[in-house]
């Protein structure tokens, strides 16, 4: 049975043997140097999580592309205002992903996880190069903007924020997103 993305990712993290974990969704692909560049960034900063910039490719219009940059340092507060961390762009310490398993498939479970990790560990590092090619489909979880907005609001509520703080964070997210 399909238990959702969270269960699949968590199972992979549990079965993995290495020190680092990288996720790659089925319709995305990486630059061949992605992992090497991220390992160097993690070694340099001592962070537990690293992400990269990404190039968005629209399924309906493949010639239309958009580049998303990432800052070199990403804090919890910055991440509350907008999710710059694409799941398939992440390289993270396995021990941290075991500590913070993904849950809540009904919201953006990866965004929720990154926020929980940064709340404890402080910062993530970013490699500002589009080392991830990310495909956006209108049928995907993030493709429907209204549905995605509701999932983002639920992330803030899952973090224990009250209604007004959640609405404030969501407004910041919407402006930055």
Residue locations for each model-derived region?
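Conserved donor NDP-sugar-binding/catalytic core segment of glycosyltransferases
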Residues: 33-65
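Glycine-rich, basic loop-to-helix element that forms the pyrophosphate-binding segment
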Residues: 1-16, 37
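Conserved nucleotide-sugar donor-binding catalytic segment
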Residues: 14, 69-147
């Amino acid at each position: 049975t399909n238990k959702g993305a969270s269960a699949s990712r968590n199972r992979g993290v549990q079965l993995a043997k290495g020190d680092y974990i990288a996720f790659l969704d089925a319709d995305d692909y990486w630059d061949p140097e992605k992992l090497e560049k991220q390992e160097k960034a993690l070694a340099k900063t001592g962070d537990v999580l690293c992400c990269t910039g990404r190039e968005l490719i629209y399924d309906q219009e493949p010639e239309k592309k958009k580049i998303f940059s990432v800052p070199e340092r990403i804090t919890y507060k910055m991440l509350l205002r907008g999710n710059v961390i694409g799941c398939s762009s992440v390289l993270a310490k396995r021990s941290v992903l075991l500590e913070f398993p993904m849950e809540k498939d009904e919201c953006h479970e990866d965004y929720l996880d990154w926020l929980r990790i940064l709340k404890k560990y402080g910062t993530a590092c970013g490699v500002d190069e589009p080392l991830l090619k990310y495909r956006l489909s209108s049928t995907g979880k993030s493709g429907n903007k209204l549905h995605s907005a509701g999932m983002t609001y639920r992330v803030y509520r899952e973090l224990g924020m009250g209604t007004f703080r959640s609405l404030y964070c969501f407004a910041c997210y919407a402006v930055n997103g």
